[in-house]
């Protein structure tokens, strides 16, 4: 397993320090202030890859994690599964934004993504996930996405999504229909403990918001392309 690691700590005058920024090929990390960008040095993931990123945001620190480009998951000759795991711990009064570019699941690929986040009670979070089934003209491969988020040591969200671009049920009107992208945006904002500050819930044909227990909201959306998907996920 290839492990990359980030540790963010609160610095002087509210700044954020990164005492640990450890890349592990093919996961290469590049920092600018409190923003870290993930560069996939060798492309992929490729079937058989097992990659892990460990993130720790200390009390009062802020970290934004992005990727430079979309991840394109491709099959290997043996048809092996690829696995990417992200584990994050966010301390008291700290903030973490996880805003990677979309993950494209190529035809013939099998991929699993696992995200585990542990938040302090006064921590805040923005977490966006975007999946694309196939490149242009492809139906896409198989993907399983698991998301576990705890707040104050208690479960906040448990989500599992399994899709197969070659499966007729996945492509039926009951699941994706004509959509090729699916995504979610999870926001945890302690200020929403005050109901007057929480945005009103909403829903539409292709997206909806769901208020979770505590000061948290999950938006889920379907779209024909990533531009439309990101627009839907940006609605508060």
PLM features per residue range, with description:
Residues 1-102, 107:
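N-terminal, charged/glycine-rich beta-strand/loop interface patches
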Residues 3-5, 50-52, 83-85, 112-114, ...:
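Broad gene-expression machinery/nucleic-acid interaction feature
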Residues 27-29, 49, 74-79, 108-110, ...:
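A short, polar/proline- and glycine-enriched secondary-structure boundary/capping micro-motif
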Residues 39, 129-236:
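A structural signal for small-residue-enriched, beta-sheet-centric alpha/beta enzyme cores
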Residues 58, 118-120, 150:
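Feature marks extracellular polysaccharide-active and adherence modules
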Residues 62-64, 95-97, 124-125, 183-184, ...:
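Structural motif
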Residues 106-114, 120-144:
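Acidic (Asp/Glu-rich), glycine- and aromatic
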